[in-house]
């Protein structure tokens, strides 16, 4: 899906922005474009203030290392030949970060625990033996290994049950509370409002509505946004 007239920015220091829309709306394209994973044909894309189309590949790699990226498909993302713990540690090794192996392993275990994975048997297993939901949580831990300034998540809770989904969002919000900014893609407006202070609603590659999450949920202006809200499952009465 090509993007058309999309203009948005995300501040540092713990800002969180959710991109919402149905399949094919351009959400994943926008996310991948933000870190230069899709060739830029027109327009301007800046990452940490630098125009991506103007910088050499080595500098782009350095910029990307300041980001964590969680792709939509966890099945093809994790290295198949590595154990879970090694897969989480791998970004530091690739980046040349110097630290004792035991310390690196402990750091990886702490990150996995943030997303509810604490079983040593899981740490030792390979990604191919995990469920989709477990793989998503491993991907989140892996994306945080380098302590990113910006985390980009593409439907990171799509394979979770409701309880685990909430725990993951809470963990991510703790991270934004510590200063990490986040760009979060989802088809679920309610989840978006929980994850981020601001929402952008995409349809057919265009922004049809944007603003504070609370305002959009309580007073949607665009018919498409209204339809997305009406399609949400009703919350149980208490």
Residue ranges and their predicted role:
Residues 35:
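Helix-to-loop junction immediately C-terminal to a conserved catalytic motif
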Residues 43-52:
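Conserved ABC transporter NBD signature motif
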Residues 52-68, 94, 101, 216-220:
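ABC ATPase NBD coupling module
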Residues 126-130, 134:
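Conserved ABC ATPase signature
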Residues 192-194:
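A short, surface-exposed alpha-helical micro-motif characterized by mixed small hydrophobic
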Residues 210-211:
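ABC ATPase "signature
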């Amino acid at each position: 899906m090509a993007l058309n007239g999309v203009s948005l920015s995300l501040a540092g220091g713990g800002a969180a922005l959710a991109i919402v829309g149905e399949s094919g709306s351009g959400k994943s394209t926008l996310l991948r474009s933000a870190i230069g994973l899709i060739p830029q044909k027109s327009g301007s894309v800046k990452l940490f203030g630098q125009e991506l189309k103007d910088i050499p590949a080595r500098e782009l790699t350095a910029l990307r290392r300041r980001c964590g990226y969680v792709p939509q498909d966890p099945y093809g993302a994790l290295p198949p030949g590595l154990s879970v713990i090694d897969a989480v540690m791998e970004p530091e090794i690739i980046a040349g970060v110097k630290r004792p192996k035991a310390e690196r392993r402990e750091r990886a275990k702490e990150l996995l625990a943030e997303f509810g994975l604490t079983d040593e048997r899981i740490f030792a297993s390979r990604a191919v033996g995990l469920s989709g939901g477990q793989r998503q949580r491993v991907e989140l831990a892996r994306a945080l290994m380098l302590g990113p300034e910006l985390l980009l998540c593409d439907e990171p809770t799509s394979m979770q049950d409701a309880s685990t989904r909430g725990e993951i969002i809470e963990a991510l919000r703790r991270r934004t509370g510590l200063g990490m900014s986040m760009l979060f893609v989802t088809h679920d407006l309610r989840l978006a409002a929980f994850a981020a202070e601001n929402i952008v609603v995409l349809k057919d590659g265009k922004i049809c509505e944007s603003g504070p999450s609370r305002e959009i949920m309580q007073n949607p202006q665009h018919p498409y946004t209204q339809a997305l809200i009406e399609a949400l499952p009703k919350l149980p009465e208490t």
